[in-house]
């Protein structure tokens, strides 16, 4: 449990670190060490934990860093699919995530973040990053899917070595810069940014909208787009509540031109604690959760994105079941976080 004072300390630590890295010419929008979610084991997360716990966290720190490096080998290449209508010039671009369940039989896509169908937004192009690798047989021409390429072996170690050598050459053997970019989120950001820029160059986009999660691929893509296409207006949508320690949402390079938020308290936290200029924020009602689209949440257990202390959680849950009165509990449906639906660790935890 992190106290209020410690929350502020972490936020201030991250702010100062970002300033320091920018002064030393580190590309903070690309660096995995400058991405500080407290809900996912990134190098930035590990850095904060090491700052809090010191040497006690050293082995876990090293483990997280190595895991993020090795993950590059498991995600060596992403490619685009259904980029077939290059003659049509669109003015709106939506960059979002997709799962198999989001596609309709008519070839359209139902976005779960905006609660919008791809057929209902005029003159729009949709770039979807596939979470589960699904590509429908019937897909409308205004939809492009970015999908991870699969190979015979899960880990492409040759690519990992090649990536490291490329970074050595590109950054002239600067160990400091190499370590900032030699990680999965940095690699993913470069891949997505390259693909998105290539599509933008073939169209006349005036507006780009995306679910904004302050990930390196968000930050780096936005910064690269604004370098080449200053006239494009980029809108981010905060589709979820701010986390308890919102260190990843500090206003910084790569932020969208406008961030749509719901909830006056979130608006205030972004403005007063996370340094977002008020003219960059716009208060709206939620696109994602609407009164008319109520979901039945009864009798369900929702698992988080990252599950820590699995054994402890299972022991506590088992103890809860033992103490419950006979026939007092309904049959419970366990739901894995949607973006972790293919995670073997999460699936195994659910089965336990």
Residue ranges and their predicted role:
Residues 1-352:
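Catalytic-core helical/loop segments in enzymes performing group transfer/polymerization on anionic/lipid-linked
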